[in-house]
Structure formats: C-alpha cells, structure tokens
Amino acid sequence: DFGEFYCGVVDLTNPEAFEWFKDIIKEYTLGIGIDGWMADFGEYLPTDDICLYSGKSPMIEHNHWPVLWAKCNYEAVKESGKLGDVVYFMRAGGAGSQKYCTLLWAGDQSVDFTIHDGLASVICGALSAGMMGCGLTHSDIGGYTSLFDNTRTKELFLRWAEMAMFTPFMRTHEGNRPDTNFQYYDDEDTMERLARLVDVYTMLAPYTKTLVEENADSGHPVQRPLFMHYESDAKAYDIQYEYLFGRDMLIAPVYEQDKHEWDVYLPQDEWVHLWTGEEYHGGAITVSAELGYTPAFYRKNSEFADIFEEIREKYGVK
C-alpha cells in the first residue's frame, strides 16, 4: 500500500518470472520506440511473510533485489541490441549494480532546503554513489516529495537547476503534487532563467562527454570529492557539499535559501571563477552567489578553458 495505490512485487528469483518481465520491457517499452525510462523502486521487497522461488530468506535477498531489477532491464536492452543507445535510471542499488545500471538518480527528495533530505542531500549522495562505483548520477530538479504544507518554491527550483547543469544528466520533475508545487512554466522569468542554465549545460557537453567516457574507461565518477585529486589537502576530506565536476571544475552549490554570497573552499591550484574570470589560488573565500550564478570554478590550465571562457563571455557577470 503506497497510500494512493497498491502494487505487487514480481519474484525475480524465479527464472520464468524474470524472463516474463524482461519480455514486457522488450515488447512494451523498447518495442514501441522508447529509449529512456525510469526503472523505479527496486527496494520494496518485503522482508517477512513471503516465500521466494530461490528459497532464500527475504531479509537476505532484500539488498540484492535492486541488482536483479537492474539486471532485468540491462538484459532486455542488451538482447534487443540497443546497449549504448538506451538509458534507464534507477534509485536503488548496491554492490553488483554497477554493471547493470546505466544511470542513478537520487530518489524522492523533499521539495525544500533541508540538509538531510532536500537539495543538499543530493550533493553528498552523488559523491557517495561515485565512490562505490556508480559514477553517473543525477536528481529531480526541484525535488519530488511534498507532504503537508511543504511545497516547492521558485528559488528552490532555480537553485536546484543551477546545480544540475554541472551533473551528467539534467532533468526536471513536477513532483508528487504538481498543482501546488512551483513549476518552470509558471512564469516567463523562470522559463528564461532555465533556458540559460540549459544552454550552459549544452555548451559544457564536449567537456562532460569526456567525463562520461572516463567513467566508462576507468570508473572515475563524474562528480568527485575534492580529496580524489587533492589527497594531501587535509581540509578536502571534510568537504561534503562541494564537488569536482571532473578534474577541471569545482562546484559549490548554494543549498540554503535567501543567499547572495557563499563561502567556498578551494584546494591549492590555479582557479578561475566561471562567471567573473577572477583568479584564486586556493583557500577559504566568499564569492557572490546571486540566483543563477552558483559558485563554479575551473582550473586555469584546463584544456577546456576555451569552452569555459565562452560560457563566461555569453552568460557571465559583466
């Protein structure tokens, strides 16, 4: 009982049931031309009062279930000859999911600025996932879950979107209460602001593509903790809410409301502020962080500096 609907769980330990579900994906998803979908749930196997075909305890099988669900999707795509042409994203996973899951998303965050289940939570969530081998992650822009009087604001939506442009996958979601949550189409100003952010995301594509390729080749996540490239910096190990977007960019998302400035920590390097061109050499700094200009920096000697400079020329602070 999900509160608003009922559902059942197919016993994926049963080979016939596994093949049946795989055929459903082939026929009714791939078969009608769909090349991307949300492979939702995966974590709802009951832990008591059921008997599985495998004979294993559901308590033991519970954490393995997301792997079976990912494998079912993966094999459907592979057997249809569409690996590399199809992306499905999942919210549940663990050891073993890495081979079968093409993309993670962070699940159903609250539509707010709370530290443990709002915007901030997807930052450290992406870093944790990346360090366990799931290097391609993203989240619902604006969050998903509205309960009681908790509703998405315009500011939250835009702060989330400005972070999402520095992730491998940028995707909006209306949330579970579309009529009461702020949507990008609610006013012209937001549509213009979002169009700018999406264009930046598009301009970054040559750089982002190399990060995705690196993830496939070496396993390095697209979003990385600072200590991954600055091992000798003791402070880097304490930073949870900033991340390296590949080797050459550092992003410090604004995850609190009503902020116009933001404190940032930069490891020792030659950094250039994406929006102003101001140069920094590392350490603790405070920078302007107006809506739409989340603190973002790139390494001065990056081979992609021309792209970053083009972004500043088109959308930077004049």
Residue ranges and their predicted role:
Residues 1-309, 315-317:
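Catalytic-domain carbohydrate-binding cleft regions of carbohydrate-active enzymes
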